[in-house]
Amino acid sequence: MHAFRGAITMNLVLIALQLIVALGILNVWILRPGKATPYRGGAAKNLREEFAAYGLPFWFMCVVGVLKVGLALALVAAVWIHSVAQPAAVGLGLLMLGAVVMHVKVKDPITKALPAVSVLTMCAAIALL
């Protein structure tokens, strides 16, 4: 009985992590791409300026956006289709690792990279659970 309860708890933790990551990514890329936040790289006030601050072209921002939104939606789908969770988490984790590297590249204070580090950590947990 205890093992069963533990499995249910772990499954709920996994679902919570998937939804936290997915909704956070969708918030940034769909609801707030043009809004300033304290976490944008460099002195950027929106996503386009942030990618420019990293020295990355607009087309690259579009590719990253499509990948992040697609992988976030895959994490939502993984609530029902469990086999999708690990590849989606690994893909998003790699993109978040890239985000951390870009923050380091432009010498941002660590506080600006904290959301990317947090999402990277949650993606690692999803991939390993």
Per-region residue spans from a language model:
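Membrane-interface extramembranous regions
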Residues: 2-129
